[in-house]
Amino acid sequence: MKASMFLALAGLVLLFVVGYASESEEKEFPIELLSKIFAVDVFKGEERGCKGFGDSCTPGKNECCPNPACSNKHKWCKVYLGK
């Protein structure tokens, strides 16, 4: 009875350690992925020579890329859905 309790406790400790180690690796992965996504997005914006979604703009100057357009109300590039 004591041996089975010891094995169960040892198994739980091992499970906790493995879970904690994998969780710490998973926390670094999304940060790394987001930094790569934003780095690529910034590079594409510089390459195009136009402003992307969420960038400030002046209405009527056509500074935004073809898909996002400059909002007259908010003065930033946004995507218009519909008409």
UniProtKB/Swiss-Prot annotation:
Question: Which cellular component terms (GO) are annotated to the entry?
Answer: extracellular region; host cell presynaptic membrane
Residue spans crossing the bilayer? none
SUPFAM superfamilies (alphabetical): omega toxin-like
The protein's UniProt keywords, in alphabetical order, are: Amidation, Disulfide bond, Ion channel impairing toxin, Knottin, Neurotoxin, Presynaptic neurotoxin, Secreted, Signal, Toxin, Voltage-gated sodium channel impairing toxin
Tissue distribution: Expressed by the venom gland.
From the UniProt annotation, give the residues forming the signal peptide: 1-21
Keyword Membrane listed: no
Q: What is the predominant subcellular site recorded for this chain?
A: secreted
Protein family according to the UniProt entry: Belongs to the neurotoxin 10 (Hwtx-1) family. 15 (Hntx-3) subfamily.
The record describes its quaternary structure and partners as: Monomer.
Q: What is this protein for, i.e. what is its function?
A: Lethal neurotoxin. Selectively blocks tetrodotoxin-sensitive voltage-gated sodium channels (Nav). Does not affect tetrodotoxin-resistant voltage-gated sodium channels or calcium channels.
The record's domain comment reads: The presence of a 'disulfide through disulfide knot' structurally defines this protein as a knottin.
The name under which this protein is listed is Mu-theraphotoxin-Hhn2m
